[in-house]
Amino acid sequence: YLRDIQPNHMACLLLSLIEQIEYGVEYQHTTIALANMLAKKLEKYGFNIAKISDEVYTMTHQIFLLMTKKETDFFYNQALDYNISLNQKHKKLFSEDGIRLGTQQIARYNWEEQDIDELAKLLFLIKHKGSLNEIKTIRKKLIDKRMKKK
């Protein structure tokens, strides 16, 4: 039973079902592996990541960056300055505030571990107002790699 649905939620659900039929279990495993890999790398950069256990961050495509409201607002707005959209949340699940990252799209790009390293570094630099030049360089590199995969 679904209530208070929005058209975009239904579209996402339908797309997910189509993807499941077409790509199935392999895609799911890749998506979850990438989520855990990214979470581990972000944790090494000092991000506070929600965990299931010492070694497992998620059993889905989502990872949750736990932050204060002030940190969440700052990080979200910093990312927007670079045309990077993040999913800002203010819920108890996040201990009130945080950022949700999904890895479904990354799984489609077939990125390698070094690309996930770059993504983690990019998010760290954005959150900590790193070098503008370095942020733009990493962002461009990841976009270029994504465009080559199409």
Show which residues each predicted segment covers.
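Active-site C-terminal subdomain of aminotransferase-like
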Residues: 1-70
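Intrinsically disordered or highly flexible coil/loop and linker segments, enriched in small
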Residues: 26, 44-48, 85-88, 129-132, ...
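Extended interaction regions within the primary functional domain
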Residues: 5, 21, 71-72, 83, ...
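Conserved PLP-binding catalytic core of the aspartate aminotransferase-like
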Residues: 48-113
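PLP-dependent enzyme catalytic core of the Aspartate aminotransferase-like
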Residues: 95-150
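Generic non-transmembrane alpha-helical segments
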Residues: 37, 41-45, 74-82, 120-122, ...
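Short alpha-helical "patches" and their helix-cap loops
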Residues: 26-32, 80, 134-138
